[in-house]
Amino acid sequence: MVMARKSDTLSEDVLPEDVRLEASLRPRSFDEYVGQGPVVEKLKVYVQAARSRGEALDHCLFSGPPGLGKTSLAHIIANELGVGIHVTSGPALERKGDLAGLLTNLDARDVLFIDEIHRLNAAVEEYLYPAMEDFRLDITIDTGPAARAMKIDLPPFTLIGATTRTGLLTSPLRDRFQIQERLEYYDAKALESILHRSARILGIPLDKDAAREVASRSRGTPRITNRLLRRLRDFAEVEGNGRITLELAQKSLDRLGVDASGLDSMDRKILLTILDKFGGGPVGVETIAASVGEQRDTIEDVYEPFLMQEGFLQRTPRGRMATHRTYQYFKKQPPPTPQGSLF
């Protein structure tokens, strides 16, 4: 769990390099946040209204593929409200006591951020319901005939949940979030803005055409954009003059295995598995996962959304299928007859 307040700064000597850099690049206000315009504009209104009334913001649920800024929005909301933020994740809350410890340490109007909230176990999730609805904990003391119920009042707080798998949330939990927003992939222009902002913070000279090239290969995802920028900085410092030019960006991205379409080695491995081993599909995701040596959840959460968004993959009731664009990408001849009906 990470706990921070608006005036807090994380101690740099205890953070791994990537975590420290990610924290330094994270926007701290709505004005610094790039992209997701409709979502941000609504959140500004909700936050301003809650702040003017002196109330806790309604509970929020942010969904969407990984790396689009759900965690950043949670931190921004806490900063804009001027309250503390307590950060944890669904898998970390194994027992009711884990959740009770967090909730009883909240101050009035604080933000509790639960990442991967779809991975909460059922017992912990049910324990959360009265806390969300009535700001109350229902605790059972002792067991058997001596058991007795005890209610603990909690200060009003805001729960912000983040998920990449909205469909795995139970209806009772999902319905308790009064604010629900989905984050979408970023366009290239927004990613260019993020690149230039990050480059300024890190002190990296970055040419405009180089930023355009990196943005086009970033899968519409700011986290990937910033990760690529850090790797290009390494190439620029070791093999160049410290400046990221278009030529250096193109050569370095090629060496990193990120092509002009934004596909990386695992994307290509997944698609080639469908094409070469299973005749273009349909094939089940479990079979794909076993063939490429990757977890099913990772394929569904990280790789498939982008591949489907870009038209490289089709999901059908019978399994995953390659598309005509996939055959064109690999310069392969598509099958002469339909591979099967969707019905």
Curated annotation (Swiss-Prot):
Mg(2+) binds at T71. It is an enzyme of class 3 (hydrolase). The lineage of its organism: Bacteria, Pseudomonadati, Myxococcota, Myxococcia, Myxococcales. Homohexamer. Forms an RuvA(8)-RuvB(12)-Holliday junction (HJ) complex. HJ DNA is sandwiched between 2 RuvA tetramers; dsDNA enters through RuvA and exits via RuvB. An RuvB hexamer assembles on each DNA strand where it exits the tetramer. Each RuvB hexamer is contacted by two RuvA subunits (via domain III) on 2 adjacent RuvB subunits; this complex drives branch migration. In the full resolvosome a probable DNA-RuvA(4)-RuvB(12)-RuvC(2) complex forms which resolves the HJ. Has 3 domains, the large (RuvB-L) and small ATPase (RuvB-S) domains and the C-terminal head (RuvB-H) domain. The head domain binds DNA, while the ATPase domains jointly bind ATP, ADP or are empty depending on the state of the subunit in the translocation cycle. During a single DNA translocation step the structure of each domain remains the same, but their relative positions change. SUPFAM superfamilies: P-loop containing nucleoside triphosphate hydrolases (SSF52540), Winged helix' DNA-binding domain (SSF46785). The RuvA-RuvB-RuvC complex processes Holliday junction (HJ) DNA during genetic recombination and DNA repair, while the RuvA-RuvB complex plays an important role in the rescue of blocked DNA replication forks via replication fork reversal (RFR). RuvA specifically binds to HJ cruciform DNA, conferring on it an open structure. The RuvB hexamer acts as an ATP-dependent pump, pulling dsDNA into and through the RuvAB complex. RuvB forms 2 homohexamers on either side of HJ DNA bound by 1 or 2 RuvA tetramers; 4 subunits per hexamer contact DNA at a time. It catalyses: ATP + H2O = ADP + phosphate + H(+). It is found in: Cytoplasm. Residues 1-186 are annotated as: Large ATPase domain (RuvB-L). The gene is ruvB. GO terms for molecular function: ATP binding; ATP hydrolysis activity; four-way junction DNA binding; four-way junction helicase activity. DNA binds at R296, R315, R320. Residues 260-343 are annotated as: Head domain (RuvB-H). This is Holliday junction branch migration complex subunit RuvB.
